Every structure is written in structure tokens, then in C-alpha cells.
């Protein structure tokens, strides 16, 4: 016999099913009558809805509110519209089997609802589980948090009723406060995001939260300091360090409960020691609202992009590598960056009249994608030449993550990981692979490129030079590590790791990776070609989207391993021939600055496999004042010979960034006129043949003249040209400056002997490289 509650339940279910059947029949009849439906049943006025919403209501009015509730937490209108379209597609994909369920629409509704739940409740939940940002906890900081008042009251009472606490009392209070940190974390896990998800909070709200967080940490650190200072023995360094270490842990627990990891927190989790200077800088960062805002904004942007990946917005035929919204945000930020560079100048501190546009300096630096590509190609060519001389062979390796790391095409194996986590996995595999080679005393060098699949998942291409006798062992170990995780899945051996032995008859080893460099920076020399990942994209557009993808996820696209220091190479190119008193530095300067020969430079530094400590030329630094976080800074001032201890200054001027004056162009023109008048007078000529303003005009002309044949000249080389009126560009060309004009001239043969002192063996090495290039 059924109980009363069971009978009531059955009656309710019967009434509900009858009501749903009536509504379904009305919907079916409306569809038969030309898809007409009663729009007065909509919760709001018809003008408040998009065409897809109206179509959705006409198709399935029974579940309309259920569907909209599922979609309301998606961060973008584009995503909500996308899922409405998918829902309608899933609804209409059900075939008519002649059943009553299909006639009433129940079968279609069930299939479409299950599809929507699978996407929004399963895939998105995998994303949300990785972000523990607690909005309720953050919003508590807008007013003084109750837990902070409680801790403050307890500390004041403890100070009021005790004069000098004993070590036992201090230990007790340490434990209480330490427990309070775990209490904060417990609060963070218990409270749920109720009203407004973190990824929907506006930027102005984030700034307010950042300010309140910084203010709360200032109060908390001050309260802890007042309480614990009585327990620190005077001049006892051990007690002081222990106090700051404990304060660091308390602050870390509070930040972790809010969903943020403070710097170096992984060392606490792994029970490792932290340097005192790292603790100090972290405690200062926690009191900086700008630091908090940057942390919140970065997490929010990556979370929104992660949701876009889970929703299928980043895929083929939609948006390759990065969502369209994030790509537009990146383009807008690039324009803002360029506008800032154009709005600023750099000024010589010692000579304020010498001013240069900051944007021009950007174009001359390695931040310029074109120059960065040129520099990488020079390095790769040098590595290849050095490998040929030392009988090393080239391997082209491709490393891809398992299928569970890929979100594309509704992959049910997807673990919910984002591109940054996949990059960390690839890094770990590569580190373990290098460790295996190191144990076998196998050394290798080369370069790797990280690029995305269509769904944003990164994969690697690597060019590796290895000794010929170890080539097969390197291939075996690489495949072993690449297939260590889920190596038995279908297609793993074919798609997840590829090894190609570079064939010189098909092209140089550098050519194997040159295309991947160009298509991930600026698409240079690839006009008319399309992307391998997305044939609808030109390689120029492909490069822009890849750069935006790398910026959003903080992924390093290019990395060399082995070889000599690139920073030393750049400083050598700033020097003038014969400027150094050290013979080795002068030889390296001739290789880097005149011959542009990276292989010869590596030979001087000890070869591609030399350790940094064994390379004779190193950077020379000067200590600068600490930054606002109390961290000591170092600035490059030149080069030094590690063994002879001789130094050379490559940066003779100190600059400061200033806002560009509104009359900068007019002042430039007037200074040109004054310079012209001064040059026609009987006064003695200054050390430079042009004024600062006229110099900027000549620099633009020099830039146009040298652009087809070399990289932009450094400031030191320009100074040399303006002082001595002649500068060697390469073995065949020089620049001459005459009467406020500059031109390219052919070098005289008798000048070839006036180069910086180069040993006979080094000259033979350079001639050998030249002959190899001609061949």
C-alpha cells in the first residue's frame, strides 16, 4: 500500500506531465501553422530578445527558461548566441522515428538538453575547478572584514594584559594565528560564488577590490608587527628572520583563501627554504594595489579565454588559436603601446638637448619583430656552421601533448587544462629528456619553437644538433619520453612525436625551422602562403594571432639552448672597432659587429657547448637603486673579460623617459636652422658635424640607407659616424658623412688592412665561413 507522500508525489508527476504534454501539443500545432506562437508568453517584451532567443522560444518554449538560466553565466553575448545555435542544431538533428515522443517533441528536447548539460555542466566545470577565486571573500574586503577585526581585537587584548610574553606564550599565539590561516582557507572552500562570477566583474570593480586587498594587508601586517615585536630579542637576527617567515606564511594563507598564490608560495608547499629578500619583496607586493590589480586582471583574462576554449569558440572554422574577442583586445593593446611609444621621448641626462623619440629606439631594438627574426636567423646560421665543422648532425623534432590536453571538437577525454598548463607539461617532458641525455654525457644544442594547434593547445618544433655517434640514442630517448604519458592511445606514435633527420640535399638544417620562425613572428617572405593549421589564414594574419595567443597565456615562443650568450653578442655590436683594450673582446667585436658571424663568435666563447662560467666574455653590470618592492636592480654597462678582468664600457650615456613636448617638431626645425647658421660661421666646429636636431634627420636617412643591407645602427656606431664622418658597415660598404648629408660608398682595398687587430688563425676561420656561404 502506498504511503500518503508517495501518492502525492505520483499525483504531482502526473499533473506535471499532463501540463507538459498540453504545452508540447500547442507548440507542435503552432509549428504546423507556420511556426506561429504566442509571444505574450515571453517573460519580457519581445524587443528585449535576440532573433535566436525568439527562435529558441518558438522551438522549445517549455525549456526556454531552463536554457537561459544555463547560459546566463557565460561571459560573452557571442558565446550565449553560439550555444543557442548549437542547441537548435542538436534539437533538429533528431530523426523522426514515428514515435509519440518525437511527435510531442520530448525526444528532441531530451537530446538537446542532455547535449547542453554535457557542455555547460561537464566541460565548464572542468574549467571552473581550476580557478579558486572566491568573489565573496574578495567582496568582504570592500568593508573591513569581520575576521580581520577579530584578529585585531585578540592581538590588542593580548598586548594589554601581558607585558613581555614568554617563548611559550609566543608559541601559543603563533599556533593560534597559524590556525586562523587554515580557517581562512576553509572559508574560501566553503563559500561559493553566488551572485556574480569572478570573470564577469568589471575592471573598475577589480581596481576597487585591489585597493581594499592592499589596504587590508597593510593593516594586518602592522597589527602583527605591533603584537610580535615584544617577543623579538634585541639584535637577534634569527628571531627577526623567523618572524618575517611566519608573517609571510600567514599572508600566504589569507591570499590563498581568496584564490591567489603569492610569489614563491610553491616553496612553502614543497617545504623548501625561501630567501629573506624574497620574503621582504613579497610582503611589500601584498600592500601594493597595482600588483593586486595586475594579478586579478591576468587571471580574469585567462579564465575568460579558457571558458571560450571550453565552449568551442577557439577551433577551426571559428577562431584559430585565440578567440576573436581576445585577439581584438590584444590588437587594441598593441595600438595603445605604440601610441605610448610615440608620445614619449628619451633624454640624455648629461645633455638634455639630446633627445630621441622612444618609438625610434623600439624599432632599433630586439623588441621589433623584424629585427628579432633577423637575429634568430643569424644565430641559427652560426649554429649550423659550427655543427658542420664539428661533425654534428641535425634532427628536427616535433613534440605534441596527449589527446586529453586537447579541447577541440568536443573531445570527451579533455581534462580541462589550459594552454599554459600544457606548456608546463611539454617543458617537464623536455627537462626529463635533457636529464636522460646528461646522464649519458650526450650534449646537444639548437632551438625550439612553441606554436598552437587550432584549439590553442601548444606543441613544439625543435632543431637539435647532436654528435653523429649518439644520433640513434637521442631519437630513442626522445620517443620514450614523448610517449611516456598515454603512449598507447590511438595515433600516439604517429602524431605525438615525430623525428626527421635533416637531409642536406633538400636544404640546410636552418631551412627546416625557418618557416616556423617566420610564421610565428611576422610572416616574412611568405606572401601568398597559408597556415598549415588553418588554410583560411594567410601567414601574416597567422603570425598576429599566434603572437596574441602567446601574450594571453604567457608562453615563450622561441628558445635557444646551448650556444654563446646572446646578450654579450648584442653588446659587442654596440662597440666600435678597436674600442676595447682586450684582444679577445676586439676579436669578438670583429666577428659580431663587422662580419656578423655568429659561428666565429661562438668559437671565441669556447664553442656551442661551453658553459657560461667557461666563456671568456661576460656582461658587466652596475648596481642601481632598489625598486619600489625593495629589490636590488642591475643594469648592463659594458663587457668584461672573465679571465684578464679587463673591461669596456658599451653604454656611455644615461637616458630617462619623458613625455614628448607638444612643440617637439617645431623645436627640431628651429635647431636645424641654428645648426645651419652655426656651420656657416667662422667658429670652430664642434666635436660632431651636426646638431642634435639635425642629427635626428640624418639618422632617419641612415636608417633608410642601411635597412636593405643590415640591422639599424646602435647609438655608439652613430656617435662614431658623426665624430669621424666614416663608418664601416661590412667588408664592401661604408657610410660617409659630408656637409649634413650621408651616403653609402664602396670601401677601398687599402682600408681592409686597417680593421681591428685579428689574429691570422681567426682570419682563416672567417675566410672559411665565407667560402662555405659561397658554396
Curated annotation (Swiss-Prot):
Pfam families named in the record: Phage_GPA (PF05840)
Entry keyword annotation includes Endoplasmic reticulum: no
GO MF term list: endonuclease activity
Enzyme Commission identifier(s): 3.1.-.-
Record keywords, A-Z: DNA replication, Endonuclease, Hydrolase, Nuclease, Viral DNA replication
Active site: 512, 516
Swiss-Prot/TrEMBL GO biological process terms: DNA replication; viral DNA genome replication
Family: Belongs to the phage GPA family.
Summary of the function given for this chain in its UniProt record: Possible endonuclease which induces a single-strand cut and initiates DNA replication.
Protein name, UniProt field: Replication protein
